[in-house]
Structure formats: structure tokens, C-alpha cells
Amino acid sequence: TVGEKSFSFIVVSPQFKTWPSGDDVDVVVNYFTSKLRIDPTRIYITGLSMGGGAAWDYAGKYASKIAAIAPVCGASSTTEAKAKIIANNKLPVWAFHNDGDDRVSVNHTLGYINMLNSMNITPKAKMTIYAAAGHDAWSKAYSLTYKENDMNVYEWMLQYHR
């Protein structure tokens, strides 16, 4: 519930056998938007680890098609080209990472957020860096009880639409 209005989510969790590109994710988005009753102004992309990287990569090419992204310990190298597309489309971003992640460096998240904010993205790109070891930032990020500014990640997403 956001603003006293209730919403329902359709959650699609594709499992790719190889590293997915933004184009691979777009095939999934297009398939489900053509088959299910989905509000095209409220498509949100999130993922963890490789999926978090896919969220960054998708947004770096198709930012105009989605309402917000929430990458979690996203494994994607920061590029100015992708950051420009995200910033130019004013795509809301809330990224999560553990500072002691031993699989995907927190520098991926820091790089994107710092670059986006240096481009004066509106709204300002947000990140939550947990003081924690290991790769699992998703248990906390996706928890209904973890909130910042009185919003969990789902409530945060729902405040945005295209």
C-alpha cells in the first residue's frame, strides 16, 4: 500500500543459463507485457548478483521503458554510456550492496551511484551499503521490514511510474 492505495505485483524471476544482456531481459519484459495484464507505466527491474548486473545493463539501454530499478550487489561494470542513458531518462535507482562482498565488489555499486549523481540525475540515485561481510545483501534489501525513509524497496518502487 502506497498513498492509501493498494497494488499487486506480478513477479517474474527468469533463470538465465548464460550471462544475460539488456537485450535478453528485454525479450522477457516484452513477452510478459504481451501475455499478461501489466501496467506498462509500472515495470520495475531488480535482481541480485548477476541479475543485479542485468538490471544495470537493461537500464543502461532501455531506461525509457521502466519506472525504476533496484539492483542488489549488481555485477556490472560502470560505464559512462549506460549511466548517461539512465540519467537522461531520469530513472529512479536504489542500489544495495554489502561493503564486505567477497564475490562482487561494492565498487560496482559505488561507481554507478557516484557517476549518476555526478550527472545530476533526478531523483538522486540512492544506495544502501550494509556493513556486512559476504554476498547476501538481498535478504535485507527484499525484506518487507527493512525500511529507509519509512519505505521498503517495494513501497519505494511503487511511488514511481513512467
Predicted regions span which residues?
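Short beta-strand immediately N-terminal to the catalytic nucleophile in serine-hydrolase-like folds
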Residues: 45-47, 72, 96
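Short, proline-enriched alpha-helix->beta-strand connector loops that line the catalytic pocket
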Residues: 5-9, 87-93
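A conserved short beta-strand
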Residues: 64-76
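Active-site machinery of serine-nucleophile hydrolases
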Residues: 1-26
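C-terminal catalytic histidine-bearing segment of alpha/beta-hydrolase fold enzymes
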Residues: 94-96, 100-162
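Gly/Ser-rich "nucleophile elbow"/oxyanion-hole loop immediately N-terminal to the catalytic nucleophile
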Residues: 19-50, 60-63
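Hydrolases whose catalytic domains are alpha/beta-hydrolase-1, hotdog thioesterase
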Residues: 54-58
